[in-house]
A protein has these predicted regions:
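Cysteine-centric segments in proteins
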Residues: 17-146
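Sec-dependent signal peptide recognition
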Residues: 1-7
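C-terminal motif of bacterial Sec signal peptides marking the signal peptidase cleavage site
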Residues: 12-13
Length: 146
């Protein structure tokens, strides 16, 4: 009985939380505050079928204080880091009620799949396309806790 209780306590202590808040200056590599989500991502094959899931980190990078919203430093971003060290940054848009969402239209497409996953179709400045899915919940979390 004591062993199983100890094992359960140790497992609970080692379980990683989905969201981590980091205040400004709390890390060596990022000066502003940010929110990190431990999520799953999977690449999508040319036939539209997803590959195996792999861990990924999703960051919400808020605007820097006193930065103009017309500049990159004055906007909200989501940065997705894949397990192979690739990363993408996606600017977010805010509506009149200050609810954040992914942009739609243009060369990029971001669509909820209705099964807890979101499909991202992105193109970088060079025209290289990237298609992947993620089970990120960061926008729901941010909009619920604003």
């Amino acid at each position: 009985m004591k062993r199983s209780l100890l094992a359960a306590v140790l497992l609970a202590a080692c379980t990683q939380t989905r969201f981590e808040h980091h205040p400004s200056g709390s890390t060596d590599w990022m000066t502003g505050s940010f929110l990190r989500e431990h999520a799953q991502c999977r690449t999508v094959r040319p036939d539209g079928q997803p590959d195996a899931e792999a861990p990924c980190l999703i960051y919400h990078l808020p605007p820097m204080p006193d930065a103009s919203p017309k500049t990159a430093l004055g906007r909200h971003f989501v940065q997705i880091e894949f397990s192979d060290r690739r990363r993408v940054q996606i600017p977010l848009i805010a509506d009149r009620r200050h609810q954040l969402s992914f942009p739609t239209g243009g060369d990029s497409g971001i669509q909820p799949q209705g099964n807890g996953w979101t499909r991202f179709r992105l193109a970088d400045e060079g025209g290289t396309r990237s298609v992947f899915d993620s089970d990120t919940q960061i926008l729901d979390y941010l909009n619920r806790n604003r």
